[in-house]
Design a protein with these regions (language model features):
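Catalytic-site neighborhood detector that most strongly recognizes the C-terminal catalytic loop/helix
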Residues: 51-55, 159-190
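Short, polar N-cap/turn motifs at the start of nucleic acid-interacting alpha helices
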Residues: 37-46, 129, 150-172
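Basic, Lys/Arg- and aromatic-enriched nucleic-acid-binding interface segment
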Residues: 1-27, 31
């Protein structure tokens, strides 16, 4: 791979892992994610955003809280923008576009790029015959937390599933941030005393093991 393609693949890997670690959010939400008031109020330890449902049957929105566990922090340092009030976390997704039609096209294209590059990583780097995507990451978030014994209400709330008609009814401090950290750390079986994961230093075998954890195969 030439250096430019390696850089694009590195960024796609980061966005793919961010989708998994950010409660399985989709790229449309990732593109709109900002360093808002909650991020700074929590000392850079959490994101809060309004998740727009992608289903044609639903126009509802719900509040999602994402604890910034250590591996996610590494990803943000690698491919995220520097924290500034109300700045986009992943500005590369929309690349400054404000028109919603164009944003949708860019999201579709970026989803395709991530899928293609992740599948090349799986096949050419890991020697692994797996087909992965953003949808795969979202399903893995729910499945792996369930297998880890996390209650289904937490999983549903974390993914922005409606808890009623009130847009804020799913949150209201139902889960303190420390509980969110404890639960989301189970996504990669992280213990408090463990060192942060450095994605760039992972060997192919270590990367394969991490992806296996995402698939719930351990």
């Amino acid at each position: 791979w030439d250096p430019a393609y390696k850089k694009r693949t590195h960024d796609s890997l980061g966005l793919f892992l961010a989708q998994y670690l950010c409660n399985g959010f989709n790229l449309a939400d990732a593109g709109r994610l900002t360093y808002n008031r909650t991020y700074f109020a929590e000392g850079g330890r959490a994101f809060e955003f309004m998740r727009k449902k992608t289903s044609a049957r639903s126009n509802s929105m719900s509040v999602v809280i994402v604890p910034i566990i250590e591996p996610l922090k590494v990803i943000l340092n690698e491919i995220g923008a520097k924290p500034e009030k109300d700045a986009y976390v992943f500005p590369q997704i929309f690349n400054g576009a404000t028109d919603e039609t164009l944003r949708r096209k860019l999201t579709v294209q970026e989803n395709s790029n991530i899928k293609d590059r992740m599948n090349r990583i799986c096949k050419e780097v890991l020697g692994w015959d797996k087909v992965v995507s953003g949808t795969w990451a979202r399903h893995s978030f729910a499945t792996n937390l369930k297998l880890a014994g996390v209650e289904e209400l937490y999983i549903s709330e974390s993914m922005g599933h409606s808890q009623g008609n009130d847009v804020t009814s799913g949150y209201q401090d139902m889960y303190p941030l420390e509980i969110r950290f404890r639960n989301n750390s189970k996504l990669l079986n992280i213990k408090k005393e463990e060192e942060p994961i450095d994605i760039d230093s992972l060997t192919p075998e270590q990367m394969k093991e991490m992806l296996k954890k995402m698939m719930g195969q351990q």
